[in-house]
Amino acid sequence: MVKEMMKLAVFFISLLLILLISETTGLNLEGQYLLEIKSKFVDAKQNLRNWNSNDSVPCGWTGVMCSNYSSDPEVLSLNLSSMVLSGKLSPSIGGLVHLKQLDLSYNGLSGKIPKEIGNCSSLEILKLNNNQFDGEIPVEIGKLVSLENLIIYNNRISGSLPVEIGNLLSLSQLVTYSNNISGQLPRSIGNLKRLTSFRAGQNMISGSLPSEIGGCESLVMLGLAQNQLSGELPKEIGMLKKLSQVILWENEFSGFIPREISNCTSLETLALYKNQLVGPIPKELGDLQSLEFLYLYRNGLNGTIPREIGNLSYAIEIDFSENALTGEIPLELGNIEGLELLYLFENQLTGTIPVELSTLKNLSKLDLSINALTGPIPLGFQYLRGLFMLQLFQNSLSGTIPPKLGWYSDLWVLDMSDNHLSGRIPSYLCLHSNMIILNLGTNNLSGNIPTGITTCKTLVQLRLARNNLVGRFPSNLCKQVNVTAIELGQNRFRGSIPREVGNCSALQRLQLADNGFTGELPREIGMLSQLGTLNISSNKLTGEVPSEIFNCKMLQRLDMCCNNFSGTLPSEVGSLYQLELLKLSNNNLSGTIPVALGNLSRLTELQMGGNLFNGSIPRELGSLTGLQIALNLSYNKLTGEIPPELSNLVMLEFLLLNNNNLSGEIPSSFANLSSLLGYNFSYNSLTGPIPLLRNISMSSFIGNEGLCGPPLNQCIQTQPFAPSQSTGKPGGMRSSKIIAITAAVIGGVSLMLIALIVYLMRRPVRTVASSAQDGQPSEMSLDIYFPPKEGFTFQDLVAATDNFDESFVVGRGACGTVYKAVLPAGYTLAVKKLASNHEGGNNNNVDNSFRAEILTLGNIRHRNIVKLHGFCNHQGSNLLLYEYMPKGSLGEILHDPSCNLDWSKRFKIALGAAQGLAYLHHDCKPRIFHRDIKSNNILLDDKFEAHVGDFGLAKVIDMPHSKSMSAIAGSYGYIAPEYAYTMKVTEKSDIYSYGVVLLELLTGKAPVQPIDQGGDVVNWVRSYIRRDALSSGVLDARLTLEDERIVSHMLTVLKIALLCTSVSPVARPSMRQVVLMLIESERSEGEQEHLDTEELTQTTTP
């Protein structure tokens, strides 16, 4: 009460001063109020410099409009929009009692909205949007009974919408989106009979959508997306006959979709996606004759697709994907003549694809992938002239691909992989030279690759592995400068690999394994400066290994095994500093093993068995401290002693030296190789005692007459070398569900080769060519948006960020700068402006490989994955448009000294991130791997829900002298020891990196620390457990650890983290198993039986 009286006194004193001043100057009272208002502003651009106290009236001042009364004009309008003003809004605004319009939008004003605004009783339009106002909406706003437009979006306003809003009976527009408004929606909103637009998205509004909303009888636009609204959708929404737009996506609505919504006969857009809606799709939706956009994806909808949906004669886009819909695709969908987009992927649909869909002449994007569809592909698809993207992968489709597919349509993306298709590849797929991604892998296709494909100038990815294709390597293919991936493995190709392969200058992946290629490997392959993976294994190639191949300095994976290569291995192999895997096994290579192999510090696997190598094992191999998966030198003709330097390979899991002519003793220091899971020294000429190795088996030492000690005959006076008895607990003692899952994972995983990464496109894409300044279409700009976002322009982004002003920067990274942009339509985006390295020349066109990557990323949708809304290229600026995450990154919050994340939030983040990764690994088809999991790439929304971000981004950032860089290896501290360039290794690398993030959440430590503080967090945790056992001392001291249940739960999650960071990728669980273990750990709340700590640390430590 005292504070209120003091504020009142200050107001009256200010009023008295103004009156006193007005007595000594000629300026009228409202002019004095305006000068007081100006005094609280910071006018950086001096836009208000003509506000002069010497004037008698303020009517000529910038932004001021008065009535026409000549004697004593009244201020009716104050419009200071976009004047670059900062500071605060003075309470003196309440003195402008005749004001009808107040527009302070697009400035930098802060502070609270003064309650004195309620004195402006004539106010009709109040626009305060795009500022930094905070605090609550003053309840006095309810006194503005003449108010028609209340526009306050894109501020920092908090609190709830006041009940007094219901007093604004003249209100037509209530626009409050992109603030921090919380609480429930007031039921008094039902009083607003004249309200036409209610937009309050991107806030934190909770509770239900009140049934009183049915009283807003004039409502046209209802936008409450991205809040925390829950409960069922009220059936009263059906009372809103004028409703045109219902935008309620990304909330927590549950229950059924009310059939009463079909009474909204003016409805044009219904966006209910990313909620928790269940039950069938109401057949009554078919009565919405004006409906154009229907988005119900990512809910829990079940049942069949109503045939009545076919009555939506004006529909343009329908997306029912990512639900649990069953039954057949209704043939009535073929009645929607204007349909451009139909997405039904990731459901449980059965039956055949209706031939009626081929009558949809305007169809441009069709995705029916990840279902259980059978039968043939309708022949009529080949006549759809507007077809841009066709994805039917992961079904059970059979028959042939329509032979004239591509003749009439301008195909950009075609993915029919993982089906049972047979016959030949159509010749016309790239007839119009726009094909970017062609994936027909894992089918039963036969015949040759058509010339029309091998000469396709726009082609970026050609994926035809695992078919029955024949013929020779298409030499024409390498005349196309954009090709980055050629996958022809597991077919029946014959003949030589042509010299023209050296012309594929952008090639990053060349996979030709398991064919019948013969002849020598062409030396021209050394011209492929961007090549990261070369797999020519299991062919019939002969001749020497050309030294030119070692000019491919970007090589990370080189697999030449199972051929007939001969001669020596050139020493230039030691110059491949990026190499992580080298497989040369089962050839006829001879000579000595090059000592230069010791330079390959990133090597994780070295396979050279089954050759004719002679001489000694180079001691330089002991420098390969990153070697982790295997060192295989078996079945050669090696002589001399085993160099003790190999004991430096502390991460090594498999050491195979059998079937050589090695002599001397097995170095006793091999007992320190605690990571060894398997080894074989058999059939050599070794002597002396066997070191204290783990998992000792007699078969690993037989064929060496001079060896002794367990498991062979005892050595004379070798008691010190006798191994200690195992104290491990029987497996039957561990009955925890988590451990059962873990055992199933470890026991069930086998080493296998997995196909290289294929790109997935499943989200709606709208491509709009921007206009040049003269109004003519420009070929130098490209905007790609992923609906249902509205089609904004590059100019909108410039305006929203004040031409990318520093004040809008919210982050910086190696890839570029991130800006916060609030667009006129109400969307808040994180705009990543990529660092450009094009120098000189006209290089504004977006290359096809870049577009393909962008489209791939934009097509991924999951609640725990940051959404890429689009890409914009304009006059040399490359912009990525992301979903905005207001809480920033996990790394920033977690490693801030003031971090107050409790365990419940941390576990929620851990589980959310795991679910996002599991979606990429297991539910996308083909599977997608992140490659750079770290705490800074896990972003948090207002509810601390985890969103995995930046996956795949490094592949689309232009690097100097290259069209697209090779896949990155991750970030320091998160990189799995065995990381290589294939899907198999990358998948396990993701899991390792995720395990590091778990350890960060548990310990609070950064992934890498100074050596004196324990070095990397993985080794620090392992060392701590070995020294002090599994106890709460390893956990973040900032957490409250008095609750034994919480500590027990955290230690259970710690075990999961240790499994994820196992040295052996074979021992790591899959992401799907990680999610199951985390869920089970929460259910049990730490009550599970525990793993034996000693065994756990032994099986996971290097």
Curated annotation (Swiss-Prot):
Q: Which residues are glycosylated?
A: 54, 68, 79, 119, 180, 263, 302, 311, 362, 444, 482, 503, 535, 564, 588, 599, 614, 632, 661, 672, 680, 695
Q: Which residues lie on this side of the membrane: Cytoplasmic?
A: 759-1102
Q: Which residues bind ATP?
A: 810-818, 832
* Chain segments annotated as transmembrane: 738-758
Name listed for the protein in its UniProt record: Probable leucine-rich repeat receptor-like protein kinase At5g63930
Q: Which UniProt keywords apply?
A: ATP-binding, Cell membrane, Glycoprotein, Kinase, Leucine-rich repeat, Membrane, Nucleotide-binding, Phosphoprotein, Receptor, Repeat, Serine/threonine-protein kinase, Signal, Transferase, Transmembrane, Transmembrane helix
The active-site annotation reads: 932 (proton acceptor)
Q: Name one GO molecular function term.
A: protein serine/threonine kinase activity
Q: Please list the residues that carry the modification Phosphoserine.
A: 966
Q: Give the EC number(s) listed in the UniProt record.
A: 2.7.11.1
What is the enzyme's class at the highest EC level?
transferase
The entry's localization annotation reads: Cell membrane
Q: Where mainly found? A: membrane
Reaction catalyzed: L-seryl-[protein] + ATP = O-phospho-L-seryl-[protein] + ADP + H(+); L-threonyl-[protein] + ATP = O-phospho-L-threonyl-[protein] + ADP + H(+)
Q: Where is the Protein kinase domain?
A: 804-1091
Its Gene Ontology cellular component terms are: plasma membrane
**Residues bearing PTM Phosphotyrosine:** 882, 919, 974, 981
What family does this chain come from, according to its entry? Belongs to the protein kinase superfamily. Ser/Thr protein kinase family.
Q: Which organism is it from?
A: Arabidopsis thaliana
LRR repeat residues: 72-96, 97-120, 122-144, 145-170, 172-192, 193-216, 217-241, 243-264, 265-288, 289-312, 314-336, 337-360, 361-383, 385-408, 409-432, 433-456, 458-480, 481-504, 505-528, 529-552, 554-576, 577-602, 604-624, 625-649, 651-672, 674-700
- Extracellular topological segments: 27-737
